[in-house]
Amino acid sequence: MPLVLMTDARKADWAAAARRLPRGSVVVVRGQDSKKRLALAETLYGIAPLLIADDPALAARIGAAGLHLPEKRMKEAAHWRARFPHWIVTSSAHSLRALMGAHALDAVFLSPVFATTSHNGAKPLTPLRAAFIAGHAPVPVYALGGVTAQNAARLAPSFSGIAAISSLIP
């Protein structure tokens, strides 16, 4: 099952994590601080294909493989696809209703499937509910949120892959 490494603001050896990914994996470069996001993207460029989160200008500037949009910007996918037809365009989603607007995307990251420390207090969808949602999606769906090597086996075949943070960093 393909893997996606999602970065966040924590100090971690993201380059080492990216190098450990199996062939065909992708890294989504996220972060609120634009300077830190740029530095991280430059560090990771060439290690694995990069999707830049919520920053199309940076994605174009560094020659990223694509763009990752937050759920609230999912409707922009068709615009960015028209401007950059070679890009992979993804988005986050947190419900079945959100996924119904995903037609112009290449994939969606459905979260949180399990309880996760990166979004404390967020109610997990549960593997059963998440599988139901993924099974009705118009595009491939990746499970995100609290996914570990131990609980990944609980994910249904309706998922196209797994996206993770903590379980993929050394």
Regions found by a protein language model. Name each.
Residues 1-77, 81-107, 122, 132-139, ...:
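Conserved N-terminal beta1-alpha1 strand-loop-helix module at the mouth
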Residues 106-114:
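Non-cysteine beta-strand/loop elements that form the S-adenosyl-L-methionine
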Residues 115, 148-149:
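Nucleotide-sugar-dependent glycosyltransferase donor-binding/catalytic pocket residues
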Residues 115-122:
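Short, glycine/charged-rich beta-strand-loop motifs at protein surfaces that mediate ligand recognition
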Residues 116, 140-141:
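Short, flexible coil/turn micro-motifs enriched in small/turn-prone residues
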Residues 125-129:
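Short, glycine-/small-residue-rich phosphate/pyrophosphate-handling segment
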Residues 143-146:
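Alpha-helical hinge/cap motifs
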